[in-house]
Amino acid sequence: MVKLANPLYTEWILEAIKKVKKQKQRPSEERICNAVSSSHGLDRKTVLEQLELSVKDGTILKVSNKGLNSYKDPDNPGRIALPKPRNHGKLDNKQNVDWNKLIKRAVEGLAESGGSTLKSIERFLKGQKDVSALFGGSAASGFHQQLRLAIKRAIGHGRLLKDGPLYRLNTKATNVDGKESCESLSCLPPVSLLPHEKDKPVAEPIPICSFCLGTKEQNREKKPEELISCADCGNSGHPSCLKFSPELTVRVKALRWQCIECKTCSSCRDQGKNADNMLFCDSCDRGFHMECCDPPLTRMPKGMWICQICRPRKKGRKLLQKKAAQIKRRYTNPIGRPKNRLKKQNTVSKGPFSKVRTGPGRGRKRKITLSSQSASSSSEEGYLERIDGLDFCRDSNVSLKFNKKTKGLIDGLTKFFTPSPDGRKARGEVVDYSEQYRIRKRGNRKSSTSDWPTDNQDGWDGKQENEERLFGSQEIMTEKDMELFRDIQEQALQKVGVTGPPDPQVRCPSVIEFGKYEIHTWYSSPYPQEYSRLPKLYLCEFCLKYMKSRTILQQHMKKCGWFHPPANEIYRKNNISVFEVDGNVSTIYCQNLCLLAKLFLDHKTLYYDVEPFLFYVLTQNDVKGCHLVGYFSKEKHCQQKYNVSCIMILPQYQRKGYGRFLIDFSYLLSKREGQAGSPEKPLSDLGRLSYMAYWKSVILECLYHQNDKQISIKKLSKLTGICPQDITSTLHHLRMLDFRSDQFVIIRREKLIQDHMAKLQLNLRPVDVDPECLRWTPVIVSNSVVSEEEEEEAEEGENEEPQCQERELEISVGKSVSHENKEQDSYSVESEKKPEVMAPVSSTRLSKQVLPHDSLPANSQPSRRGRWGRKNRKTQERFGDKDSKLLLEETSSAPQEQYGECGEKSEATQEQYTESEEQLVASEEQPSQDGKPDLPKRRLSEGVEPWRGQLKKSPEALKCRLTEGSERLPRRYSEGDRAVLRGFSESSEEEEEPESPRSSSPPILTKPTLKRKKPFLHRRRRVRKRKHHNSSVVTETISETTEVLDEPFEDSDSERPMPRLEPTFEIDEEEEEEDENELFPREYFRRLSSQDVLRCQSSSKRKSKDEEEDEESDDADDTPILKPVSLLRKRDVKNSPLEPDTSTPLKKKKGWPKGKSRKPIHWKKRPGRKPGFKLSREIMPVSTQACVIEPIVSIPKAGRKPKIQESEETVEPKEDMPLPEERKEEEEMQAEAEEAEEGEEEDAASSEVPAASPADSSNSPETETKEPEVEEEEEKPRVSEEQRQSEEEQQELEEPEPEEEEDAAAETAQNDDHDADDEDDGHLESTKKKELEEQPTREDVKEEPGVQESFLDANMQKSREKIKDKEETELDSEEEQPSHDTSVVSEQMAGSEDDHEEDSHTKEELIELKEEEEIPHSELDLETVQAVQSLTQEESSEHEGAYQDCEETLAACQTLQSYTQADEDPQMSMVEDCHASEHNSPISSVQSHPSQSVRSVSSPNVPALESGYTQISPEQGSLSAPSMQNMETSPMMDVPSVSDHSQQVVDSGFSDLGSIESTTENYENPSSYDSTMGGSICGNSSSQSSCSYGGLSSSSSLTQSSCVVTQQMASMGSSCSMMQQSSVQPAANCSIKSPQSCVVERPPSNQQQQPPPPPPQQPQPPPPQPQPAPQPPPPQQQPQQQPQPQPQQPPPPPPPQQQPPLSQCSMNNSFTPAPMIMEIPESGSTGNISIYERIPGDFGAGSYSQPSATFSLAKLQQLTNTIMDPHAMPYSHSPAVTSYATSVSLSNTGLAQLAPSHPLAGTPQAQATMTPPPNLASTTMNLTSPLLQCNMSATNIGIPHTQRLQGQMPVKGHISIRSKSAPLPSAAAHQQQLYGRSPSAVAMQAGPRALAVQRGMNMGVNLMPTPAYNVNSMNMNTLNAMNSYRMTQPMMNSSYHSNPAYMNQTAQYPMQMQMGMMGSQAYTQQPMQPNPHGNMMYTGPSHHSYMNAAGVPKQSLNGPYMRR
């Protein structure tokens, strides 16, 4: 037949049709024309003609469909024709091929045990001659497709079994699920009715088949067949019509059958839904929705399906696995095939290929993975490939694939998104398929895959083929395949720039291209693996996106619209800008920034969870944009007040001053926030270098510009924004801290300063921070206390010179004047000075209105208001605490600046002023207690409300004060100074005035606002008291020659008259109360942080008490008698500012009637508040003063302070003095020469002002005797025991005389502690004391609460002080006995023979000191106390001198010493670790923080007291009190680091300090820190049992270094002899001189204690060890001791005592602190509150009281504190301490913590005090609760605790008021004895910080919620303080360690935060403490983790605690 068309054209057209069809398009005329014309150039007309002709010819088929014409090749008609070509001749044959036989032959021939892969079968068959003959002509894909189809059918029919990619014959005659054969059903279990089917009715059957209409007689085949009828509708059918098999028919007849219309799902029994998705079981014909199947099905299964009901169990399981394998295969298969190819390469090149695979492989795989599954692989083919390998369930290959997988799995998301390990394995296997197959098949497979992947199994098969090939026939993988694979892999790698598999040792990436720089990286960074494996990464320098190649980068740069960081620019000067990037807003940017930073940072843990952080990005700007130079990150709500968590400068910008710029900028922000800041500890090596250089330069420049005689660490902290711990460590590093005559003094090394300034002038800094260019508002207004303080410091710095002059004048005047005059002078001078300072500050503040400093000016205004509007103030405060604060800050900015000048000048004045303020606060605080509503506000202005309360409560005192101080007040007020001074005094003088009532930390912690708000009274009072303490500690600015400056110790007398603060306090308290009412409207107080208020109040109260004491002392001491240094300090503080007003001593008395306690007796008696606390507060300032100024210039003259003043001062010194005593003791060591000169005087003063401070007591038996008249009665029993222990230990520790004083301080502190304890035990006694001392104490307490209320501390202090006063009066014997015992033991343990001597010598002193300390507690800033104590402890170690300067100094020094000792003086380090043992410094730290700290650091009294008490009466009551004091003291560390930013940071800084000075030691050597924290604490506890003093000292040191918990724990430990032992052991470890040594020693300790979950018992044994260990621990103790002994030869002996126990019980010690905490709660809710109140008051208000400025932090911290220790809550320190013992902190900060500590280190103690013993550690939670309960009950914690709580309730009420939920926590916590105190603490802490209340309330619940911060606060504090230590050791953690989630863990979430903040710390700690921690806790790193993880667990723990 002739063809019409041209055959050539027809051929062309057929080609075109094929081509079009190949493109999956319909061969239309248009497409055919286009194809032919493009190929052959034929025109369209011709093509259409030829096409028409060809159709006529029949050579082309024309198909019309819906009006569209298509053309086909009749020989190859698409799908139908596809087989034709192959089959053409063979198709028929092929169709005749028995595929089942072929497959069987292949599988049998391959004979592979696991089964054969599709590939293997295909290759095998292709090798068969008959098959190759059949299919030789057909395309490979045709054979492959048919084989796959046949295999699928075989599987469906059960002939083949498929296992992953492997196929094997079904030997059981296809009884696969799928087989329809009878066998398969017959092997199924018999069917039975389901429960829901049995009861249902059956419809009447219709006897006709619905299909064939036949009956049972005749079916379709005309044969009889039974009908099956539907049970629902009755419709019937023949089984044959239904196509049922006989087996199925039999089974169905036994069931309730449903027809297809009625079928319901047997699982969900829902007929209506998803009928299309219903499967019918081949065994019972029931219906199931696919989603209702078990496991749920995503696709209709092929072949036979048996439901889960009929499926045999085993088979069911297999089915499940099979389904899982299928699903995995589905995931991996689509990707699997392509991936398989890639995988082959991958498997071959296990190294880089995974990446390569992801790169080149992905594309191919995508093509291959046409199946739906391939979609997932396309983007993540690399991942998926790996996954594929895992996905396949080949048993033999799983491990193989797994390994391959893991290598490739490291892509960023792979590990997270791989469906399952199996899936990944399968892919790995797939990868193994021969490369050739992969590569070759890519093209093929793509098509084939596209063909078969439509079927799920196809996808699997594809993979199977690859896998089969890989696994089934590996012989098939030829050498050629391998070579091909390698070749391709190399090519792929070259494209990406990867030369070979990455070397794990090599940094990846080793180079980055960043902007115009190519930077060699220093470390590896966790970039996603595909990036991190590349040798070079390309980063966009603006958005920081990372890319693989320069091309991608260039393309990105064209599109990237960024030219600066995605945030607001907050600073610009010249070409330098800083942007504040919020991690929550610009998450990706911040993550990329962290990844970039890690390339240049050794260890960094934060990469992806950047939300809680702010990133301050420094850029250098040019026309192109803002080029990244570096950045620092800070946590948004850091409890530790860390202002930097990570800092990095890119290498190309290094050594150009940018690092310093960023550090300076971070401190500028901290100052704007109104709080002292500190970098997160532990610091890295480079970080420590950078920071130490910065601190040195800043401090030297500050000293250069500050010519004050009295410069305190607190003041320095305010001026610089650097936390006291860091300052202390730096001063120590510069050798500018010395311990003289029982106090730490700052030595001005003029040559050093001048040299530095000369260098600076030669080499000007290239870039400097210009505060004027900062446009930034703090996220949170920090607690007013610290922030304002810091700002005040800055203001002071600006106006310090004028102030100094004024101060000097005032001091000189005040020296001559009586105490009242001194106090007035303090007020007036301080006011005057402060106004000057404040004025400059005001301008600064105006610029930084947001800053707390701004608040200060505002405060000054309110203070005026407060004067006239006390009530007004209160009301306002309630409403507008925050607003008022802010308003005040803004409004008073100018006045504040004036004040700032004055304030700076008259640090002493300020301190005195602070005292007055404290008095005011105290007076106000009682009302505040009454008016709990104020408490939350007080948080904002912590000092304000307490002041208000004090004003209300002791209007008379206030009036008197105001009257007295009115002279000054008029001046000050006229200058506007007074308000400012108060604020300033609070801020700066709190540090300086550890002794001044300021010890109610509010002044310091209180942001300047507080001080200003109630500047007169608060400040004056604080100033006076502080100043006295400061005078003793800091008043002395010893020139380099150590010559005493104008305010020598001898001048202490003059200075004593100077305690104008005290006289002012009494007179001014009432006066100021009036003034506060008038001058400080409520708003003012509101603005003042609660701590400030508390401080002010407590300081007022204390002042009143101190004034009384002073008056008594003055009566006795009118002649120049050496009053205890703390007294001297107090007086110095009081006097120096008050000197001009010295003539108004009566006023002071008048202001503070002896019968009337300024502070609530509770406050007075609050152990935490006791001397240690006040000392803490004042001591820091004192140390600063003494250091900058002279040792306590004011030699307490007999007539220096009236007895009231003395008693107040005694109380203050007690509270202040414990630190002052610590300082004093250390200073006495240092100033021993001076004391030799002034010794007589000071002794006289001491005796005259017996309770003035432990040191006072030691120095002046006369003074002490006087106070002891009251106090001794109650204290004598205690003192007897304490002193016995004290004396014994002192004899042991007799070498260091300062330690004796410290012992005295410890005793005093312990008395205070005991007061706290007795608040539980002797609440009745406390009541008596309250009655006896109620008026003075109330006023005192009022003062103190004012100060401390700012942090719950005020409240606690108040009640504590009241209790203290009462207890001191009545219970002093009892309380002091336990407290003293504890203190003595602690102190002795912390040990210094001096302490012992002092203890014996100071027994009376202790009594007096106790009273005095009680007040001082309030007045002392816990932080100051801590810092001083740390210093004291460390210095005590070094020379019991240098650091006793201030608590802050001590704490800082202590921490520093950990560092310094390790770095400079290993022994010192140990000393720091062993502080308590050496100086009682540790105890001091621990006890001193509350009151113990003072004693332990300054005087054996405190440690002896606490320690002695602990030893003497294991009853937890006393221990509780000491513990509490410890907590307070420790809280000073922890809480202060949280609350008291200056001090708190110091505390945290302690840890930080440790990390600063011996970051390596403390942080890197967790054991050192641990020892310090846990060791010291534990050691403390341990020591307390064997060496009460040493243990406590150690604990103090630890606590200071580590945390409140430690101290509390130590205190607890001391309380419990077992605990003491535990405590001692860690102390020994702690005593290790260098962190490393500490670590070394500590590891055992830690090990001991890490086992303590079980080893809580171990700790028990270790505690016993500690007892024997006193000598065995010397190894550890020796290290500690060595640093101590070498630094302080006398202290060493105590350290040995303490240390051996510590050493043995290093871990136990760590935990002992927790028990101490428990004991603290035991000691009494009031006691605890007192401690914490004081701590907050002292620390929070005084040093770091920043409730408002760091409102969130403070609040959180407070919450933490509240949770941690209801009593110590005011500061977050206690909580911080209990941070680790979060559960403790939760339930009862003290209690819970004690319990955890107890369990671990204090288990013995716990046992001693209660049944829950060793297991406590493991069951820390349980322990906490039982322990707490037991302890409480043992220590009167139960009912007495409740009583105390009741006693403290006012304070709590205060706090409650301050913290809205405080009262609730109080109540809630109170429900349980354990938590009873906690609530107090909570309430109190809440007061300072609103959060605290809630937290206390929820102890367990809120803990986590608020605790996030609270816990953080606590934990962070703990971490801070114990950063390396605590985390490592986590006394708490270890103890909590067995706790469900780490008792700490409640705080743990915060801890996590803390970890974040503290991340580096924890990190360093981990390195430092891995051994100890690893042993003790889980591991050092674990600690870190635990800290982080603890958050949640802690919550759990806390919850349990709460429940308990």
Swiss-Prot record:
Record-annotated site: Breakpoint for translocation to form KAT6A-EP300 and KAT6A-NCOA2: D1117, D1118
Region (Disordered): 334-375, 441-464, 785-1445, 1461-1621, 1637-1721
Pro residues: compositionally biased ranges: 1650-1699
Active site residues according to the UniProt entry: E680
Compositionally biased intervals (Polar residues): 446-457, 1508-1529, 1556-1573, 1702-1712
UniProt zinc finger (C2HC MYST-type) residues: 537-562
Modified-residue entries (Phosphothreonine), positions: T369
Subcellular location: Nucleus; Nucleus, Nucleolus; Nucleus, Nucleoplasm; Nucleus, PML body
Biased composition (Acidic residues): 787-803, 1043-1053, 1065-1078, 1107-1118, 1224-1245, 1288-1305
Residues carrying the site annotation Breakpoint for translocation to form KAT6A-ASXL2: V813, G814
PTM annotation: Autoacetylation at Lys-604 is required for proper function. Autoacetylated.
Purpose: Histone acetyltransferase that acetylates lysine residues in histone H3 and histone H4 (in vitro). Component of the MOZ/MORF complex which has a histone H3 acetyltransferase activity. May act as a transcriptional coactivator for RUNX1 and RUNX2. Acetylates p53/TP53 at 'Lys-120' and 'Lys-382' and controls its transcriptional activity via association with PML.
Name under which the protein is recorded: Histone acetyltransferase KAT6A
Organism encoding this protein: Homo sapiens
